[in-house]
A protein has these predicted regions:
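Non-catalytic signal-transmission and effector/linker regions of two-component phosphorelay proteins
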Residues: 1-4, 17, 21-31
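Hydrophobic anchor at the beta1->P-loop junction of P-loop NTPases
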Residues: 215-217
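Cofactor-cradling patches in redox/metallo enzymes
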Residues: 40, 47-57, 61-152
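ATP-binding Walker
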Residues: 41, 220-223
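Nucleotide-state-sensitive switch-loop elements of NTP-binding domains
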Residues: 191-212, 223, 229-285
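Extreme N-terminal, non-catalytic leader segments
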Residues: 5-6, 150-213
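A short, charged/proline- and glycine-enriched loop
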Residues: 27-33, 210-213
Length: 285
């Protein structure tokens, strides 16, 4: 059967305009992404948009908020065993900030963590090229926004982060309380492959010389849980200068998308102390 030529009664098929949003990316792995704005930067509107779209695309987003230092961001990425870091920087110090972050990750054995940045017109094209040549995974420009759209940029970012940080066949690592990277890997192994490591965990707990006390805190959203925990951390660190403490935070996974917002770190100012280990987890159900 012949196809009629385009006319008023038979218009030509519509085509997607250049830069139109792409179908949402479907990750193969559980992607964990740390989001923040850079130090001395209160412009957080854009990072909020990006972390919401990333969450809606299936990522588990650990949001730190604005005015975060390189060390705070790197500490969070290591403790959370994240595949990527997304930071907006509008304060003019992006060249030093992103390079310092890249170097610190490598020094601490986390060079696999992808760094993504953006800063509108503040970051010049030649600076973007230099940062990406240095090892920053991608710095998105206004031209990228026009060409890819918001969803397209998120798809590109998550696609670069869609890899496993641990392998199912790995043995549960031995670690000490101050080895946050090994501890984070152990939690990821148990979280991703619980059946394989359940017996090992139970044996280690049974053989432990000291069983620390465990305090559970729960409540409705906005009840002040994170603020209360931050105050407990502050007092603990002051009263017990030789002891360490760990905080495990659990937030719900969105059933429709599989993503989650893990935002408890925003209110925990004392969590930046090296004697504190924080891990955010999604229910994944």
């Amino acid at each position: 059967m012949a196809t009629p030529a385009p006319s008023a009664s038979h218009p030509a098929p519509a085509t997607a305009p250049a830069g139109a949003p792409t179908p949402a990316f479907q990750p193969r792995h559980k992607i964990r992404l740390v989001t923040a704005t850079s130090l001395f930067d209160g412009h957080d509107a854009s990072i909020h948009i990006f972390r919401r779209i990333a969450q809606a695309t299936g990522a588990e987003v650990v949001h730190l908020g604005h005015n975060r230092s390189v060390r705070e961001i790197v500490d969070a990425a290591i403790q959370e065993d994240a595949q990527g870091i997304a930071v907006t920087s509008y304060q003019g110090g992006h060249n030093e900030f992103f390079r310092y972050m890249h170097d610190m990750l490598r020094e601490r054995g986390a060079g696999h963590v992808r760094i993504f940045g953006g800063g509108g017109g503040v970051i010049l094209p030649e600076e973007i090229a230099a940062l990406q040549a240095y090892g920053i995974a991608r710095v998105y420009s206004p031209d990228d926004g026009r060409a890819l759209g918001l969803q397209g940029m998120i798809d590109d970012m998550l696609g670069r982060c869609d890899f496993a940080t641990v392998r199912a066949e790995e043995a549960l690592p031995a670690f000490t309380a101050d080895d946050h990277r090994a501890l984070a890997k152990a939690i990821t192994l148990v979280e991703n492959h619980p059946d394989k490591h359940r017996e090992t965990v139970q044996k280690r707990l049974a053989a432990a010389a000291y069983v620390p006390p465990v305090l559970g805190i729960t409540g409705t959203g906005g009840a002040g849980k994170s603020s209360l925990i931050d105050e407990l951390l502050r007092r603990f660190l002051l009263d017990f200068p030789a002891m360490r403490i760990a905080v495990l935070c659990v937030d719900p996974t969105r059933k429709k998308t599989g993503g989650a917002l893990l935002g408890d770190r925003i209110r925990m100012n004392s969590a930046s102390d090296p004697r504190v280990f924080v891990r955010s987890m999604a229910t994944r159900r």
